[in-house]
């Protein structure tokens, strides 16, 4: 027998939903200087501090975290790092722990970006440990997942992303994704000028949310899923309007105040999701 949901139950479900704030994250990568950063932050503070339903975050190299804390602590712009150690403390030369990031006021940290995974041979297991370290110390992890062009052309992109998620789920459970962020970044789109089509992005974002929801629906509803990979002022509005795209992780364009501002305004102007 086919079950139907009464109008009263539907109304109750709608009342329980809430609007989901958009999230736009600047990933400065290994760029910047004290002077360049100050000029860029001046414009960010002027242009991006008054949004009503978009949170802007700047993730900078470690040496500039104190500068971000000093410049942004009186604004509505949050800040974070681009990596975190998997260890709490100890003889790990060159590493920076989650607790240290908190000392500099960080509230976000990027984890598992494909550039790091490739250049420094970061395994899914190590990325999962870093994810948990971030959560343990009150940082919001921005977990990067995505497939190569070869994997997409072979039609195994969902299998690849599923494996990346399962490493965390199998170790820590799906509940850890509550109030976390996943950034879907097709590796073939990062820094290439090629972006996933809205349909490609929508399909993968829906797959990711359904994957988490099949285990823990509350975590799936609280999870934000960003798109990253050649987001620019020309495609931002179209991408941000897609269901299940909660914002973007922005690389190159975040180094240009006009371009990054245009992307943030596109997020602010896009329809809110309710979950």
Where are these regions (language model features)?
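Active-site loop-to-helix "anion-binding N-cap" substructures in soluble metabolic enzymes
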Residues: 2-183, 187-275
């Amino acid at each position: 027998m086919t079950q139907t949901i009464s109008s009263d139950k539907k109304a109750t479900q709608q009342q329980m939903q809430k609007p989901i704030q958009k999230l736009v994250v600047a990933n400065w990568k290994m760029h910047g200087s004290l002077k360049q950063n100050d000029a860029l932050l001046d414009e960010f503070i002027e242009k991006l501090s008054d949004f009503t339903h978009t949170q802007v975050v700047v993730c900078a190299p470690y040496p500039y975290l104190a500068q971000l804390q000093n410049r942004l602590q009186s604004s509505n712009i949050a800040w974070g790092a681009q990596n975190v150690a998997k260890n709490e403390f100890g003889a790990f030369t060159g590493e920076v722990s989650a607790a240290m990031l908190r000392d500099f006021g960080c509230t976000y940290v990027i984890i598992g970006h494909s550039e790091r995974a490739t250049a420094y041979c970061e395994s899914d297991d190590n990325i999962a440990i870093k994810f948990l370290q971030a959560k343990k110390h009150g940082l919001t992890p921005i977990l990067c997942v995505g497939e190569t062009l070869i994997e997409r052309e072979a039609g195994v992109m969902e299998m690849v992303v599923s494996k990346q998620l399962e490493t965390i789920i199998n170790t820590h459970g799906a509940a850890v994704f509550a109030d976390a962020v996943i950034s879907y970044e097709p590796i073939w789109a990062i820094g290439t000028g090629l972006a996933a089509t809205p349909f490609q992005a929508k399909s993968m974002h829906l797959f990711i949310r359904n994957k988490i929801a099949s285990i823990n629906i509350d975590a799936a509803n609280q999870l934000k899923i960003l798109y990253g990979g050649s987001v620019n002022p020309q495609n931002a509005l179209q991408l941000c309007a897609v269901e299940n795209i909660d914002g973007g992780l922005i690389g190159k364009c975040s180094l240009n105040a006009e371009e990054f501002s245009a992307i943030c305004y596109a997020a602010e102007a896009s329809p809110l999701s309710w979950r």
